[in-house]
């Protein structure tokens, strides 16, 4: 038998791999930005850092996946937004350190290469990159029969951004008396889905629960993670924020303390948190303790900003959206996050 047939009999479709590359080119082209060098398909993606105009550049990187939210995308056969989730999880992390995203790379592993489905996945990645103003400069699609089932795939990404050395956000400027502002999340985002899947294990996804304001359950569960780059970057450039917390796995309790020193704490006014309907539904149908919800989910706030009191009005002026004044920084007595 020929080498091609031998490989095909092992479960690897080389021709399908070539087709995927051709299908995704138009999506990758959407993400072009100044600084990108070379073309898709090289051994390494290239970026000219001098094109950023940053005087003292510091590169900041982040990598992440989308957890078991991917299993719901597979279950509901909807693959066009999960890529945006992957980009969001990476770029929101680096924006929290003050970085402007520059470029992104993705990795998709699957049991069977289905070009149409993988095109949808990468189209979602490209949409996320457009929203983050990051170039998709490379990636890998690995067909791994025996490792994954034919319908299964996994997705991960890697983002690199740049910050002016003097504008890095490391929490050192956060102090007692600072105000905590919350930016709304789009939904669950990409964390806590092992619990979400357990709560709704017996649901088809087509249900319209009374708490979800007329939306089908599957649409709410797969709502893509919001990307905060365009909202946060102008604030960073004007040096209006002392700290930023991306509210991901571990909710408020684990993520908010990551932006300040150990002798400080965050006091949160629960009544001012814009809790989304899906979280009320999860608490009800999952019989989850109310306080535990804040240890798992973003509860409607995907990004938290620490600002000086005198900068609050300017921040609200720059942000073309509702901004929630949900708390303040206090001296730590016991817990790092106090929800009142």
From Swiss-Prot:
Upper classification of the organism: Bacteria, Bacillati, Bacillota, Bacilli, Lactobacillales
Protein localization: Cytoplasm
Reaction(s) this enzyme catalyzes, per UniProt: 2-formamido-N(1)-(5-O-phospho-beta-D-ribosyl)acetamidine + ATP = 5-amino-1-(5-phospho-beta-D-ribosyl)imidazole + ADP + phosphate + H(+)
Entry's Gene Ontology molecular function annotations: ATP binding; phosphoribosylamine-glycine ligase activity; phosphoribosylformylglycinamidine cyclo-ligase activity
Record-given protein name: Phosphoribosylformylglycinamidine cyclo-ligase
Originating organism: Streptococcus agalactiae serotype V (strain ATCC BAA-611 / 2603 V/R)
Superkingdom, natural source: Bacteria
Enzyme class per UniProt: ligase
UniProt-listed InterPro entries: PurM-like_C_dom, PurM-like_C_sf, PurM-like_N, PurM-like_N_sf, PurM_cligase
HAMAP family recorded: AIRS
Protein's pathway: Purine metabolism; IMP biosynthesis via de novo pathway; 5-amino-1-(5-phospho-D-ribosyl)imidazole from N(2)-formyl-N(1)-(5-phospho-D-ribosyl)glycinamide: step 2/2
Biological process (GO), any one: adenine biosynthetic process
Sequence similarity: Belongs to the AIR synthase family.
Keyword terms: ATP-binding, Cytoplasm, Ligase, Nucleotide-binding, Purine biosynthesis
GO cellular component: cytosol
E.C. designation(s): 6.3.3.1
Pfam families named among the record's database cross-references: AIRS, AIRS_C
């Amino acid at each position: 038998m020929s080498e091609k047939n031998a490989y095909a009999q092992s479960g690897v479709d080389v021709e399908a791999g070539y087709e995927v590359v051709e299908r995704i080119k138009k999506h990758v082209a959407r993400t072009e930005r100044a600084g990108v060098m070379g073309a898709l398909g090289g051994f390494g993606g290239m970026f000219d850092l001098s094109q950023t105009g940053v005087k003292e550049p510091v590169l900041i990187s982040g990598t992440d996946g989308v957890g078991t939210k991917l299993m719901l995308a597979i279950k509901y056969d909807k693959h066009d937004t999960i890529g945006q989730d992957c980009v969001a999880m990476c770029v929101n992390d680096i924006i929290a350190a003050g970085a402007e995203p520059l470029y992104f790379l993705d990795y998709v592993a699957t049991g069977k290469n289905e070009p149409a489905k993988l095109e949808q996945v990468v189209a979602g990645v490209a949409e996320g990159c457009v929203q983050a103003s990051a170039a998709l400069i490379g990636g890998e699609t690995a067909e791994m029969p025996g490792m994954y089932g034919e319908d299964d795939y996994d997705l991960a990404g890697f983002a690199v951004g740049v910050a002016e050395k003097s504008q890095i956000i490391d929490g050192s400027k956060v102090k007692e008396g600072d105000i905590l502002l919350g930016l709304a999340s789009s939904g669950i985002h990409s964390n806590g889905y092992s619990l979400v899947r357990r709560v709704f294990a017996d649901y088809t996804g087509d249900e319209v629960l009374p708490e979800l304001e007329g939306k089908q359950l599957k649409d709410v569960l797969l709502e893509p993670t919001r990307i905060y780059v365009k909202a946060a970057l102008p604030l960073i450039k004007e040096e209006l924020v002392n700290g930023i917390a991306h509210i991901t796995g571990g909710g408020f309790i684990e993520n908010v303390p990551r932006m300040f020193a150990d002798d400080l704490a965050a006091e949160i006014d629960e009544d001012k948190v814009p809790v989304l309907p899906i979280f009320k539904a999860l608490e009800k149908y999952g019989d989850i303790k109310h306080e535990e919800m804040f240890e798992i989910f973003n509860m409607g706030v995907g990004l938290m900003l620490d600002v000086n009191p005198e900068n609050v009005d300017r921040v609200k002026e720059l942000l073309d959206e509702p901004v929630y004044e949900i708390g303040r920084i206090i001296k730590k007595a016991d817990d790092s996050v106090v929800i009142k």
